[in-house]
């Protein structure tokens, strides 16, 4: 099992939580982005730079994903592909995507895209709060504790 990160849009504070978790648990963490990344040096942390382009990083994550891997992403279509491939998907606010909620989230995303394309100002997501960071760290720790103990 390893952790994949859709790193282009992943907040720095979430990456820092992931770095610490990889070091603590010995679980391989791979950050995938279309720009250079400079994580701390570690046996457990790798980067994978992909060419620029629409969904190139997402496609590379899905291509390399193994059943049971964890993907950290806010990209709902990527999360849907991860779930379909037998992986786990967690967003930076600590919410797991699942077979039970992914369809509704995709529909909501498509609806918001339709609103935006018709000129409605929908705004973006709120900034991550300290509580969001704590929820993410707790859910990640719970997930890794289950995986590492198995």
From Swiss-Prot:
Signal sequence residues: none
Family annotation (CDD domains): PIN_YqxD-like
Protein name: UPF0178 protein AZOSEA36080
Domain of life: Bacteria
Transmembrane segments: none
Record-linked PANTHER family: UPF0178 PROTEIN YAII
Family the UniProt entry places it in: Belongs to the UPF0178 family.
A Pfam family assignment: DUF188
Organism of origin: Aromatoleum aromaticum (strain DSM 19018 / LMG 30748 / EbN1) (Azoarcus sp. (strain EbN1))
